[in-house]
Amino acid sequence: DEFVGVISTARPINELKELIGKLNKSQEELNYYKEEFFKQISNNSSFNNIIGSSRTLKDILYICEKTSKTTSTILIRGESGTGKELIAKAVHNNSTRHDKPFVRVNCASIPENLLESELFGYEKGSFTGATKSKPGKFLIADGGTIFLDEIGDMPMSMQVKLLRVLQEMEIDPIGGIDPISIDVRVIATTNRNLEEMIKEKTFRQDLYYRLDVIGINLPALRERKEDIPDLVEYFIKKLNIKLNKNILGISNDALNLLQQYQWPGNIRELENIIERAMNFCDEKYISSFYLPSYLKPTIENPNKFDLDKDNILPFEEYE
């Protein structure tokens, strides 16, 4: 007689389901910690996290690192989208004030009639509706850094008051009796030609010299195109997390198109284009197919780029 049998080593179905659940949970935890790690890198904004290896950028970062150890006023100049706020945060985070507030004020976005109270605060009862006192941005930034974005858009009436603050290091809240002493480092930015504004008498020359103790000029992206590959790699890694993608890089033909373009929107426009491409790309590498048409030479003239404004992606002004 012959006996035939079957030996089964199958695990119970519930045990397999439990194992799959643990694997999924581990993947979710891994994604969470990766995202939190990237947030910490972005928030720290140290000089090591400013992307690029061009000689121009290295020279700027050398100046920034030296000046981060001082308390002198800094004026950062550059086109929209060149990363002026990123530089300002890096200077603050590498200074002795790194554990104190970094307070941002956009001088272009606050109405003229509200700018004084926003900067210097007000006392209870100083005007109709002032039911309680409110500290201004300068007082909130005491001990730290105040970042005056788009200083070229500050009204002349406020420029003289800011000049006094820089000279005396004290503020006068609206409705207050006595001035309040402050200890604040001022970092200002602009994308405007302040020298021309001084000639046109729309910007005070004495304020300009108070702000421009340390002047930092950020180049446009078209002036440091050798940094584009590093920036693209950085944005792909960053956006893989945001978009839940696993794109490995960009093709040579696509990268060549990016390096030929003039980048009126600078780094913010580059990030915008990479994010757009990654939303549609289902391959491992971003090819030129996924780039907007205005980056590509026209058929009639292979050296001319289609700059029809209707084809250009909108992008927010970024500092």
Q: Over which residues does each language-model region extend?
A:
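Conserved helical "switch/dimer-interface" subregion of ABC/ABC-like ATPase nucleotide-binding domains
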Residues: 63, 122, 161, 165, ...
